């Protein structure tokens, strides 16, 4: 069976680079420094118009934990409807209860709103209290895919749990490793986990084209370089694709 490479892209340019590099699917996010938040309507609409590969979008109203207020949940529901109206192929979301369990009721509501779109439960799973039960809850909520590092700092470190989760799922859901996936470890991860879909960022730093640069004034958190950003590299995606094809 062909192996699938999904790239987490933080901009339209990154989406295009992912496609050029040979990815079969893109997850479009904003604010990757916070783990990804919901992208803008404009970014979603333009990505849908420019991509020939599958396009998913993260539905996450803010950084931080995955326990959402009623207002935040309502915003997530509206964002799911926007993605459906734009013709996206899927949405990526994750909700937990205060006790660290999957919020089955709310996840099921969003999955129902998604309609024909695929629903991936993201790495909120990696903060869940009990992974085997969390997997059953994700399946019961109507998700078709789980993105996980195996509750470890990286997917290669969590490969043993990922393999167990894949076996437990038994084809009811696709387990997709993500976090720390690189050309040098993706083949080993495929062998250790038995998974066939993989999630990576393949990012590199891009310097700002600004010639005039005012020092001492920041627009965000202290220590953040205002004149550099991370973008998906088509060459890194291509290296991942080639390594995965040989796995």
Swiss-Prot record:
It holds the Pfam family CutC. One of its GO terms (molecular function) is copper ion binding. HAMAP family: CutC. It is found in: Cytoplasm. Keywords: Cytoplasm. Transmembrane segments: none annotated. One of its GO terms (cellular component) is cytoplasm. The keyword Cell membrane does not apply. Gene3D superfamilies: Copper homeostasis (CutC) domain. This is PF03932 family protein CutC. The keyword Cytoplasm applies. It comes from the Bacteria. Belongs to the CutC family.
């Amino acid at each position: 069976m062909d192996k699938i490479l999904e790239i987490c892209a933080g901009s339209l340019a990154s989406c295009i680079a992912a496609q050029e590099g040979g990815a079969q699917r893109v997850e479009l996010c904003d604010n990757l420094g916070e783990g990804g938040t919901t992208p803008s309507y404009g970014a979603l609409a333009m990505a849908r118009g420019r991509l020939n590969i599958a396009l998913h979008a993260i539905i996450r109203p803010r950084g931080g934990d995955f326990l959402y207020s009623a207002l935040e949940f309502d915003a997530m529901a509206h964002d799911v409807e926007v993605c459906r109206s734009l013709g996206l192929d899927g949405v990526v979301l994750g909700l937990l209860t205060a006790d660290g369990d999957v919020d089955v009721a709310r996840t099921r509501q969003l999955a129902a709103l998604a309609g024909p779109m695929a629903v991936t439960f993201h790495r909120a799973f990696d903060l869940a209290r009990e992974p085997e039960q969390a997997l059953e809850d994700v399946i019961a909520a109507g998700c078709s895919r789980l993105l996980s590092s195996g509750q470890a700092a990286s997917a290669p470190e969590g490969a043993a749990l990922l393999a167990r989760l894949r076996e437990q799922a038994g084809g009811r859901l696709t387990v997709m490793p993500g976090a720390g996936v690189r050309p040098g470890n993706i083949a080993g991860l495929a062998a250790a986990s038995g998974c066939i879909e993989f999630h990576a960022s393949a990012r590199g730093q891009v310097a700002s084209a600004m010639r005039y640069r005012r020092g001492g004034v920041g627009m965000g958190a202290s220590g953040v370089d205002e004149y550099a950003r991370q973008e998906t590299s088509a060459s890194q995606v291509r290296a991942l694709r080639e390594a995965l094809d040989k796995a």
